[in-house]
Amino acid sequence: MSIALAGVVTSCDMDAPTQSTLDETSVFSQYSLAESEIMSIHVSFCQTNSYRGRFLPYYGLNSDLETGSGTQPSYSKAMSYDDKNSLWAYNTLATNGQMNTDNNAYAMFYEGIERANLAIQGIRKYGHIENNRDMAQLLGEALTLRALIYNDLIKAWGDVPARLQPNNADNVYMPRCNRDSIYKVLLADLKEAEDYCYWPNENVITKSTERVSKSFVKGLRARIALYAGGYGLRGDGYRKSKDPELASDKMYAIAKQECVDIINQHCNTLGSFEENFKKLCQDNVAAGGESLWEIPFASGRGRVVYTYGIKHQAADQYTSQNQGGANGPLPYLYYDYDKDDIRRDITCIPYEWSKDLVDGKSYQQLRGINKWCFGKYRYEWMKSERALSLGKNDDGVNWQYMRLADVYLMAAEAINALDNDQQTAWKYMKPVLDRALPAAKVEALKAKYTANQEAFFNGIVEQRGFEFAGEMLRKADLVRWGIIDEKMAEAKQKLTDLSNRAGSYKDLPLKLYYKNEGENIVIYGLNHGDTDAEGAALDGYSSKQWFVDSKTGANLLTEDYINGLYVGKPSLNCLWPIWQTFIEKSNGLLNNDGNYGQLSD
């Protein structure tokens, strides 16, 4: 048997893996060679059209928090099936030009699954895991990475073929499989993997967030349980599973236990909100902090800052790339935060770095109300020797797949839903809020959220939004909660109100007032209650029309923008079709009939 080997690396290395004629026995009985097989799974994450350039930039848009900022929502473009807009606007065709290729994310995910299948089979046969903890760790990693990929396949495509054995003559063509069956395999696999994987820093292998630890295995199992027990689009409509083994209470019980286990182990700690993202941008992969696992992009791969970072209009003192700002927050998100919430000014950024350079340096300048950037990922937070030597497109910053704040909030959600115990649930929400808000405001939220079960659930919905905006968890959360239609309609109304400075946004000034202090911009007019009279009286400040085009007077948040957020009913269009190229090569076993080809039972 020919085994594909990749170099032993801790990040995705995009050099083509070498081919070896070593037999399966030799590869999977030696730790270093078996480890190479685990690393080869990472390569599939990082291919050009896999997570790097297709799944991470597009899955998760549009939500009630996140949208395109470079290419913006557009009803007219979505209705004419513009490739990018229709991917976001809940009306995607199987022939989409961004996706309908043989090397797209759908194919790369199955490539990663095949590599995981080979590793799982080989290590089980020849790894002697009962006598070798490190080989057992590798088996746990393979099981976990396969579960991760399958979970993302289901999020995007729903019922998909279940390839759980290496490819052979008997499984070349496979139909869709009910996702419930896959979920049950994943939950069982992850339970097994828990027995194999080390806790963070328990072993040299798990000293890095680029390697799977028991904390991540448990966290992923909790996340998958919440998806399995929640709503999704099926062949007969948008509903929860009918399988009693995946009943919501059973899935919440799994999520509760797994999350509480992670927290009680004390192997991971919450630092400050900003610290987490600075460490991410600086390639600090030391385990034990907030990060549980990251997609390990190599220095020459990955478009995290390119896609989700603050826009730089030119190569400047911080980066050799004129990138960033492709995706950003919906314009109202900034105004929905409490003004004292430290997450607001880290998550939502109204400025960019200038194209014009002064003494070779750019400076911050206002963008537009329809062009906000995310601020969790920044070239200016990267190590300068790295950021100033980047190629045209890739920045090499890892994608943080899960962090400890998610574990705390999943625990809080599960305890509220399962036990109807708001006081205990609050104990798991509180650490996330303590680092974000002043103590008095945390206490006020406690009174609001712990009033009853519904109030606490609404608090979870609200705080997961404020905590994870820009991390692309929101769309899947809205789907599993069964509220995606409600929240997306609310998003359109909020955009309409913001455009007209009405409703919750009626107390905002028409203009923003700003000045530069060195390279940094100082802005007045972004807080509720700020006024144009006060702004105009500020010494040394310039002003900019924020809501309307300064030349035409037309609203920048146009009807085309607002209605472009979604054009199909979100709950019935929350999946992508399997791309046409794969349908045509499926020997008639795959289709997108009905609700995107989904099964009813």
Question: PLM features: residue spans?
Answer:
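Conserved, well-structured interaction surfaces
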Residues: 30-31, 35-36, 43-49, 75-157, ...
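Long, intrinsically disordered, low-complexity segments
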Residues: 12-14, 109-112, 187, 208, ...
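An aromatic- and glycine-enriched ligand-binding surface/loop that stacks and positions planar moieties
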Residues: 13-81, 160, 183, 187, ...
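C-terminal substrate/ligand-recognition segments
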Residues: 91-96, 342-430, 579-601
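Bacterial Sec-dependent N-terminal signal peptides
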Residues: 1-20, 477-480
